[in-house]
Amino acid sequence: MINEDKIKVAVIGCGFFATNHILSWKNFKDVDLVGVCDLDEERAINASHLAKGTPYFTDAELMLKEVRPDVVDIVTTAPSHYNLAKLAASLNISAIIQKPLAPSLKESTKIVDLAETTQTPMMVHENFRFQQPLRTLQKIILNGEIGQLLFCKISFRTSYDVYRQQPYL
């Protein structure tokens, strides 16, 4: 049952990373996950089961036209991002796009131009920005605890479970 007071979200791409996206969307009280889509029907069916019966599709355009989400979460490979973003924009649907935004700077620029031209909100998904270890590091840097930072390179590898009890989206 769809609640009109909630944000309607659909997911395109039901591979490895989509599992975390789907579970996260299902955890938001103000979100209705209204559809999942993958070209591979078996993946789409599995995602539907993971999402507790959310309708599944193998055709992104059909899904977007049928379920009319407010937001589409594009969790596919980078080469497909532009065409899916263009589809979302043509239907006036905001998009969250898995990083990398596109396979090249030129194609990334096309997506940015598309968003500006159509005035369709499009965002790049950054999944670890709000993880507790990175938030702690940000606080240390902002408080000047390590002095003036001139350069920083972070490799985020740890035995710490970054998924348990942490925001993913």
Give the predicted meaning of each segment.
Residues M1-A51:
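N-terminal Rossmann-like dinucleotide-binding module
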Residues G35, D70-V71, F151:
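Short, Asp-centered acidic motifs that coordinate Mg2+ and/or phosphate
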Residues P55-L114:
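Beta-loop-alpha module in the N-terminal Rossmann-like domain of NAD(P)-dependent dehydrogenases
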Residues S80, P100, M123-F130:
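Rossmann-like NAD(P)(H) cofactor-binding subdomain of soluble oxidoreductases
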Residues K110-N127, G147-C152:
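Rossmann-fold dehydrogenase core element
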Residues F128-L169:
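Predominantly a Rossmann-like dinucleotide-binding segment in NAD(P)-dependent oxidoreductases
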